[in-house]
Amino acid sequence: MTSSNLIKQLQERGLVAQVTDEDALAERLAQGPISLYCGFDPTADSLHLGHLVPLLCLKRFQLAGHRPVALVGGATGMIGDPSFKASERKLNTEDTVNEWVEKIRHQVSPFLDFDCGENSAIAANNYDWFGGMNVLTFLRDIGKHFSVNQMINKEAVKQRLNRDDSGISFTEFSYNLLQAYDFACLNKNHGVALQIGGSDQWGNITSGIDLTRRLHQQQVYGLTVPLITKADGTKFGKTEGGAVWLDPKKTSPYKFYQFWINTADADVYRFLKFFTFMSLEEINALEEEDKNSGKAPRAQYVLAENVTGMVHGPEGLAAAKRITESLFSGDLHDMTEADFAQLAQDGMPTVELNRDADLQQALVNAELVPSRGQARTMIGSNAVAINGEKQADPEYVFTDADRLFGRYTLLRRGKKHYCLISWL
């Protein structure tokens, strides 16, 4: 992406929900590099897919020559953003928040270049300026610039005030002031002139623009990326097991890869624009190729490879592909012990069994059949495989050779029903 028409390029990819004073921002970007920031509050010990679009937007700006600031909210994470939340957030302890700050800082770092000259990325923590601030300073220097009338009319706050079952505490009500002051501080300390964030952050961003103008007489800008939705109306970034996390210990690279492989045809080309750095020409050519091939589309695999490689690196991508191909072919010889651990983590149903369990009992415990009698029938009809090999003996007893790495056995009933045994 080039700096001269960066906003237009982002719009062509569907990455702009709202922007303040678009013409003035476009003109400012055309004049030369700026500093911009995006904030990430430590409300959990990992970022999730919802954070990926704004994080990648920071990267897009850096690739165009601008300087990104990744702000982790060590202070705001102690409060919790009420924007469009149905109820009060749970307040976490300071130790917990500090631990999460470090984890999120570590997650953000690989996406940005912190050693590339004048536009090297900066990592910041808003606890640095809020940690030593007393309440009188907060009220005198920040609070006096805010009208309560305007604050309660912000859509994110109005929704909470209008709920019969939940109002809003002064703690969360004050969050808007904290995020606004972040913008003013970063403007003063690093010359930050643009804040980007999710579309739910619009009210907080515009407050920061107003406060920066009042405190420093600087014109600054805001840009939000859209809330990602799926064509069928269901939430993006969720599975039956909950959120899809960027931390491989919470969502394994295999499950992460499978999430993208299962993208609907109606969504995949749009998601390629959101989540990859492929050019629009490349994406359009891929769509045309898929349309005319008469085969299953390639786009899902291109998307899965791009995003998994970006988030989990070459080794994580290789493991995800290796597991996928092994399960598809039934040949498990290329799988490593770590690959089986990914399956046990979240890749498929897993059951722990004592080593004296026979095949019939294993099928019942794995919930692949309802009874030992049904297990006998399934085994006898050649519908059961152990580690990819069919087993037709109803009286079969497992041997050490079935326990891969001394610990794992993969059962399959039919073509699609799997369970991983973890032997005790």
Curated annotation (Swiss-Prot):
Entry-linked SUPFAM superfamilies: Alpha-L RNA-binding motif (SSF55174), Nucleotidylyl transferase (SSF52374)
Matching HAMAP family: Tyr_tRNA_synth_type1 (MF_02006)
UniProt motif ('HIGH' region) ranges: 42-51
Residues given in the record as L-tyrosine binding sites: 37, 175, 179
Alphabetic keyword roster: Aminoacyl-tRNA synthetase, ATP-binding, Cytoplasm, Ligase, Nucleotide-binding, Protein biosynthesis, RNA-binding
Species, as recorded: Yersinia pseudotuberculosis serotype O:1b (strain IP 31758)
Gene3D superfamilies reported in the protein's UniProt record: HUPs, RNA-binding S4 domain, Tyrosyl-Transfer RNA Synthetase
Pfam families the record matches: SYY_C-terminal (PF22421), tRNA-synt_1b (PF00579)
Protein name: Tyrosine--tRNA ligase
Quaternary structure and interacting proteins, as annotated: Homodimer.
Subcellular location: Cytoplasm
Any single Gene Ontology cellular-component annotation: cytosol
Family listed: Belongs to the class-I aminoacyl-tRNA synthetase family. TyrS type 1 subfamily.
Reaction equation(s) it catalyzes: tRNA(Tyr) + L-tyrosine + ATP = L-tyrosyl-tRNA(Tyr) + AMP + diphosphate + H(+)
GO biological process, one term: tyrosyl-tRNA aminoacylation
A molecular function (GO) term: ATP binding
InterPro entries reported for this sequence: aa-tRNA-synth_I_CS, aa-tRNA-synth_Ic, Rossmann-like_a/b/a_fold, S4_RNA-bd, S4_RNA-bd_sf, SYY-like_C, Tyr-tRNA-ligase, Tyr-tRNA-ligase_bac-type
Binding site for ATP: 238
Top-rank lineage group of the source organism: Bacteria
Motif ('KMSKS' region): 235-239
EC number: 6.1.1.1
Chief site of localization: cytoplasm
